């Protein structure tokens, strides 16, 4: 049971004055010594609010005394002072962890020594803070980090700090998983220390494919989050076929992309038909009903599976070898699909797509993604548990991220911005954040923090200011470079524009329509430019977003003429993207909302929907995946005929549905 420790030395009294960070104080070793002594006292007495106030009020004059004309280099001289660096990182550390969470350790003798050491180390605090994300439980993360650090032998101290931070931020919440093919649906809970020891000890024994010590925490979260037991991962390290794979920057024999097709595809799992003949050296395959196992990596390799099994195997096996990897999924013309992605030795990701924003090698091997409308992938952030776009993963491969003159500088400017905010100086905060966006142009977090600051400024941030900000944002994400353009970020910029620019009363409806339609036209021009690669690279998902955004602007004109304009716009959007089933499906509801209540347009809508369906989607070509996808589409379409009180127009779809269902039943008997 934890007890309150006896503090032998007398704790320094809590002074009311701010800590001084002027030029003289920054060179005075006594100032740093005082801060360290006070910090230690706060660990025991928990008076963190007063400590934070003394820091934020003391740091602010030092920051404002610098010259704004120095731009992104504005605070570099300040950072040369260890005392200043300690004060600024401490301030943000206390703010983010919160005084309430820090008080939890007042009676925790296991964490207190670690916390005192950490609060005296600006570099380690900065490492931690730079990798924190919204939603992290930082109190729990610190408790986990202390446990990991305390487990290291003396000769290992400091060697695995990045691994410790990544593990702490992933395991700040209970980490558990269930195997997809386990009939018992048992959940396995992974212990943070056990997971840390697996990677630390195997790194020491040089059994991993990567040098864990050289990977950053934002990369290592894609390693320690393996949804497997340690026994499974130990099996992977010993499995002969996996041991033959090598991590490479390009396509070569036995590279890690081959982990995906190592799992034999079981079409009978999809159709319910009789099992195929097993490959040489494997046991005879059993029917689907008898093929369920506990779903371990070893069993998946033995039994085979479908794309989700291939993705899970490739991702988890890579992580077992210390390779950052992600299981990615998307929606295309043949339904949902899963593939995987992994980090190459050059710290860039092989996403299995054709996007090469950082001049990645052209000969990258595939990772299971189909060239059939799967240009957009999604995965789950292992640190927060939330779904994210694959572009957020690929952006971490920015070569500038590992350069101190870019992302580190930008983060330090963000730390300064938070001090300005704590002193109610929003303009100073915004200036710091804009310098930060110049230092790290492709940092999503920096741009979002700057946008949040503009929103906090309220009416002080007028439409022109927002327009200038978004212009810079689009330039940063290469709006004019067709080969390096980040379309997701352009969509995010449009979201801000809809909220803060297109609300300008000086803009006419025609001007707003022209601006909001621009992104839609950019994506459509891109599709035409790609030609043969259309289905492989076109971001149909963002075409839907752009079309919906344009439709919202047109819908503001509630006159009959306005409704007619909206109808024809959405009709063109549906026609322009008829080859991609998910896009067609995604536009239907907006199209219906545009015609609802107008019987003439409702009938036009139903006829147009049915016409495109018959022309583009009726023929499933005996492709079981396409059949199931079209079946799902019919289920989406049929209710619209009822809503428009035209059930007879939908009779053909009812007939097609019955036909596809019969064909799928036949496949089960083969």
Walk through the language-model features, giving the residues of each.
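Extended amphipathic alpha-helical coiled-coil/heptad-repeat regions
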Residues: 430-670
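Acidic, low-complexity protein-protein interaction segments
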Residues: 22, 45, 53, 60-70, ...
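Intrinsically disordered, low-structural-confidence terminal and linker regions
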Residues: 1-64
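Charged, amphipathic alpha-helical linkers/stalks
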Residues: 357-451, 455-458, 462-463, 467
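Secondary-structure boundary elements
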Residues: 69, 79, 83-301
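Hydrophobic/aromatic-rich core segments of domains that either
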Residues: 289-297, 308-396
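Soluble non-cytosolic domains of exported or imported proteins
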Residues: 301, 305-309, 624, 628
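A structural boundary/capping signal
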Residues: 6-17, 316, 449-452, 488-490, ...
């Amino acid at each position: 049971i934890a007890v309150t420790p006896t503090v032998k030395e007398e704790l320094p009294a809590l002074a009311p004055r701010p800590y001084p960070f002027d030029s003289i104080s920054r060179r005075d070793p006594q100032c740093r010594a005082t801060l360290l002594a006070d910090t230690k006292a706060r660990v025991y007495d928990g008076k963190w609010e007063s400590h934070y106030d003394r820091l934020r009020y003391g740091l602010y004059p030092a920051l404002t005394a610098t010259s704004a004309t120095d731009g992104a280099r504005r605070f570099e001289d300040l950072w040369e002072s260890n005392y200043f660096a300690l004060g600024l990182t401490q301030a943000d550390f206390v703010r983010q962890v919160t005084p309430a969470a820090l008080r939890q350790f007042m009676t925790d003798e296991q964490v207190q020594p670690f916390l005192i050491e950490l609060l005296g180390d600006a570099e380690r605090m900065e490492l931690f803070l730079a990798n924190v994300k919204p939603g992290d439980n930082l109190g729990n993360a610190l408790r986990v980090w202390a446990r990991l650090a305390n487990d290291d032998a003396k000769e290992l101290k400091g060697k695995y700090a990045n691994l410790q931070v990544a593990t702490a931020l992933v395991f700040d919440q209970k980490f558990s998983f269930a195997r997809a093919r386990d009939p018992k649906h048992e959940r396995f809970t992974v212990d943070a220390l056990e997971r840390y020891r697996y990677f630390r000890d195997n790194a020491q024994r040089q059994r991993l494919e990567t040098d864990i010590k050289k990977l950053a925490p934002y990369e290592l979260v894609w390693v320690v989050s393996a949804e497997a037991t340690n026994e499974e991962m130990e099996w992977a390290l010993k499995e002969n076929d996996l041991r033959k794979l090598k991590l490479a920057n390009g396509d070569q024999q036995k590279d890690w992309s081959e982990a995906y097709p190592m799992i034999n595809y079981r079409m009978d799992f999809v159709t319910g038909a009789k099992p195929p003949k097993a490959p040489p050296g494997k046991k005879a395959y059993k029917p689907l009903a008898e093929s369920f196992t506990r779903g371990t990596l070893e069993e998946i390799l033995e039994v085979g599976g479908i794309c989700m099994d291939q993705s899970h195997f490739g991702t988890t096996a890579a992580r077992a070898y210390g390779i950052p990897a992600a299981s990615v999924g998307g929606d295309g013309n043949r339904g949902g699909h899963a593939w995987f992605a992994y980090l190459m030795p050059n710290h860039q990701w092989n996403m299995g797509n054709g996007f090469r924003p950082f001049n990645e090698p052209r000969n990258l091997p595939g990772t299971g993604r189909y060239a059939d409308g799967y240009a957009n992938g999604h995965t789950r952030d292992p640190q927060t548990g939330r779904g994210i776009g694959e572009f957020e993963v690929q952006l971490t491969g920015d070569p500038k991220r590992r350069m101190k003159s870019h992302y580190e500088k930008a983060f330090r400017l963000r730390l300064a911005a938070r001090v300005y905010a704590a002193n109610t100086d929003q303009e100073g905060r915004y200036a710091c954040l804009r310098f930060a966006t110049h230092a790290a142009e492709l940092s999503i977090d920096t741009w979002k923090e700057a946008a949040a600051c503009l929103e906090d400024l309220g009416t002080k941030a007028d439409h022109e200011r927002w327009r200038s900000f978004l212009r810079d944002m689009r330039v940063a994400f290469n709006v004019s470079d067709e080969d390096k353009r980040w379309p997701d970020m352009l969509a995010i910029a449009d979201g801000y524009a809809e909220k803060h620019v297109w609300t300008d009363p000086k803009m006419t409806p025609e001007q707003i329509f022209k601006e909001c339609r621009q992104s839609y036209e950019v994506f459509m021009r891109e599709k035409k430019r790609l030609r043969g690669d259309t289905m492989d690279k076109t971001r149909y998902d963002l075409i839907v977003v752009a079309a919906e955004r344009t439709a919202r602007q047109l819908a503001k004109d509630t006159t009959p003429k306005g409704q007619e304009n909206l109808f024809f716009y959405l009709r063109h959007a549906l026609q322009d993207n008829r080859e991609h089933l998910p896009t067609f499906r995604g536009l239907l509801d907006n199209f219906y909302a545009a015609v609802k209540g107008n019987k003439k347009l409702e009938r036009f809508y139903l006829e147009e929907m049915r016409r495109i369906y018959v022309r583009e989607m009726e023929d499933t070509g005996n492709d079981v995946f396409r059949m199931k996808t079209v079946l799902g589409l019919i289920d989406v379409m049929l209710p619209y005929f009822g809503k428009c009180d035209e059930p007879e127009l939908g009779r053909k779809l009812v007939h097609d549905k019955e036909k596809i269902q019969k064909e799928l039943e036949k496949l089960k008997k083969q």
